[in-house]
Amino acid sequence: MSNLAQVRALSKGRVTLGIRMTDRPGWRQLSELLDLGPWPPTDLEMDFDQYVFACVLSRALEEIDAGEATATEATGLSQVELRDILNRSFPAPTIHVFRLEEVRDSEPGPEEALLRGLLLAHARAGDSASVLFAKIIARRALRHDHLWRELGLFDRVELSRLLASHFPTLAAGNTQNMRWKKYFYRKLCEAEGYSLCTAPSCPQCKELESCFGSGEGESASPVGKVGGEA
């Protein structure tokens, strides 16, 4: 099956190479754009990184169309980085819908910079994709919903796979299956030598469920629901 055919299958909510997607507006729009041109010939199987980029871009499209963010604001990437991803992985017409010529680069705030630094410190050496994902994850982690949802992924399992692949030492430290955003902030606190938690141990903490709950919710549920964490 060609990469384009796989994306079409994914956009219809089918199971393809173990990856499932629901019929979200951003993904529908992205898959419709893919019909306008040929998918660049790569490996027979759809690369997981490429799939994640497509998920993130579909989520960004939803925010762009809603007037909530520009492409750079939604992804944490620069114009140059976004253009490079689109040129390498998507047909030419896809670029125009992101309106890159109309936007400016979005600089990270202090909190985002700390998250980005944490991820970069554990990024896979010499992998440019890991750097891009560090920026994307740091930006999307500032949103209020589950991190996997804010990345446009199908479920938390896909997020765990992404982190294990690109930030292996960081992911390996989450031995108790802590929710990822909670885990990130715990690591930041540890690096600064203090803790936000006043309980002597996790089992005695009243926030136990918020830190160690499944974080699943409904897989690929409609975007816009807030209040959860991955």
From Swiss-Prot:
The keyword Transferase does not apply. It comes from the Bacteria. It holds the Pfam family NifQ. GO terms for molecular function: molybdenum ion binding. InterPro entries: NifQ. GO terms for biological process: nitrogen fixation. Keywords: Molybdenum, Nitrogen fixation, Plasmid. Probably involved in molybdenum processing. Belongs to the NifQ family. This is Protein NifQ homolog. The gene is nifQ.
